[in-house]
Amino acid sequence: MTPQEHLPYADPEKGGLKLLAPLRVLDLTTSIAGPYATQLLADLGATVLKVEKPGAGDDTRAWGPPFLQDVSLWYLSVNRNKHSLTLDVSQPAGREVLDGLLAQSDVLVLNMVPRVQRKLGLDYDSLKAAYPALIHASLTGFGLTGPRSDFPCYDLIAEGYAGIMDLTGELESAPQKVGTPAADLLAGQDLALAVLAAYIARGQHGRGTQIDISMQSSMTRFVSPRLLPYLGSGELPRRSGGKDSVIAIYQVFDTADDPLSLGLGNDRIWQRFWQAVGDPAFGARTEFASNAHRRTHREAIVMRIAELLRAQPRAHWLALFAEHSIPAGPINRLDQVAQDPDLLDKRLIYRARASNGAIPQVGLGIGFDGSQHVHRKSPPALGEDTDDVLRGWLGYAGPRIDALRERGVI
């Protein structure tokens, strides 16, 4: 038995969102960032055609363990609501198929470096004359220009370039990667946002757009609340285990049993905290009158709060802080997140039926008219929609499809 057994099923009556139903997206990406971007578009209702290498498919299909019924769970995390077509675009017959699909698509998404795009004739300059309305969206490690534009890149590499690893962890520890593929997910989110903007603009002027997303740039923008203060002050932030926030009290504290997070983000919350814990006089001291004052005396304040919170279990403090509108929360493990009744009720975490049994999913998490239901189609098996796409999009008959398959084109 796996943890998904307690998850609610996606409601088939809901049918998913259809906000982007007219949009057709041709997705030639692999790994996480690009597929995450196109899953966001698919969740909103776009038709996403995932073009994969015959026999191998998306790199994430081989990422594991863990696997579920021989399917990579990493692959399952970023590929729902899509259709899979296997196609060797390097063969002339494969390129002919791709050109037919491009003629019927609104968006092309790539995560090939510029050199490979040019080699395959899939760069913006090679396509814009034949497909002037096509939105050409490129997601690479370092963008389409610059000295690193042809460098390969993964999330780990982008995090290192952007400075986030140097800020993550304890001061005495080595730099640490963020606990999720943050650069992948942020760059993917940026691409989805950019596609929506380009789609709106095309509706106004009828032309396509070249979109250039860099994982390094997306991740660098992510650290702007730390980078900008350095640029303006010259004070270089260092790893601190999350204890160096501009907010004086904004960190994790131990309690009598489990740790909690606490954020006293303004003067009103500061006063409410000390009222709640029964020591309003401490909170009213003039040397703690503002956040700047409290930062000066942070060490003494942290010692006092730590002493207080160790006296009672976490549940006691969270109930008290909720009553007094004080921002605080648990430090959940993923197994606890997976059992959060609010997330389950909203179907953010759910399971869906697939050809080989039930699969777990994490939804979009955005409500539209009171609903967060996005599931229309489980992540596809490799090439499961190839014949349907060739027939439905391009009008190919059975013998022509069979010939392509025999030649290894599909």
Regions found by a protein language model. Give the residues of each.
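Beta-strand segments within the central parallel beta-sheet cores of soluble alpha/beta enzyme folds
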Residues: 208-216, 320, 401-405
